[in-house]
């Protein structure tokens, strides 16, 4: 083989390798996980055919669905060069709890509260869909309670009287009544309600780029810094 061709191939491999390595991922590609990415400033990132916000210093964030099965396809474009990265998603086992013999009213809410539930769900969805330019998602997240007891885990699901309920999309922490609760990271409060039907005293924080944290408490609360 001509030496010039060999040099060209080696150069192409070097450039492709450099482009691929210029994206760093902090987080595991497991169902339900949160991934923080770092790329070159000015790069364009597309994940699953959707362009993702990237900060001016190259940070971006995305999450994997609870039941995602297909690979994650990532395209990076910089200075006219396009790089494709494919990541396999690892399957995760979730806890399933079956409870039978419950009174129907404890499984399905009464019709007179349907309108209230629908209205409150819209408030929550609106707050969770905010995709601001805040950059707090880059910071380390902390536990909202010190020495907390975990009573509910992400992805778990209950089947009540044979009817599957929505999976649990968070982590429940238990503490003594009146214990101060910390925000998990810097952010802006986008929803503060004291008496929602399903979640009681509820706070939603926006950390930027579609990243939100969500708390529901026993007692009414006022966020403060």
Regions found by a protein language model. Name each.
Residues 55, 184, 207:
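Short, acidic, Ser/Thr-enriched surface-loop or helix-capping motifs
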Residues 86-199:
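Surface-exposed, glycine-biased beta-strand/turn segments
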Residues 216-225:
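Single conserved hydrophobic/aromatic residue that forms the stacking wall/gate
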């Amino acid at each position: 083989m001509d030496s010039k061709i060999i040099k060209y191939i080696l150069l192409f491999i070097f450039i492709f390798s450099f482009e691929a390595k210029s994206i760093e991922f902090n987080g595991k590609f497991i169902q339900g996980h949160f991934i923080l990415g770092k790329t070159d400033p000015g790069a364009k990132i597309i994940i699953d055919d959707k362009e993702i916000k990237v900060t001016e210093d190259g940070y971006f964030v995305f999450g994997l669905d609870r039941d995602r099965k297909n690979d994650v396809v990532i395209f990076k474009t910089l200075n006219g060069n396009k790089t494709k990265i494919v990541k396999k998603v690892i399957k995760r086992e979730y806890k399933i709890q079956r409870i039978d013999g419950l009174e129907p009213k404890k499984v399905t809410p009464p019709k007179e509260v349907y309108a209230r539930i629908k209205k409150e769900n819209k408030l929550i969805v609106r707050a969770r869909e905010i995709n601001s330019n805040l950059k707090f998602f880059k910071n380390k997240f902390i536990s909202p309670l010190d020495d907390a007891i975990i009573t509910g885990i992400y992805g778990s699901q209950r089947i009540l009287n044979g009817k599957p309920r929505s999976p649990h999309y968070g982590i429940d922490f238990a503490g003594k009544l009146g214990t101060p609760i910390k925000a998990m990271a810097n952010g802006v409060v986008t929803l503060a309600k004291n008496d929602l039907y399903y979640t009681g005293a509820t706070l939603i924080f926006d950390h930027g780029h579609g990243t939100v944290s969500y708390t529901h408490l026993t007692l009414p609360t006022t966020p403060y810094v």
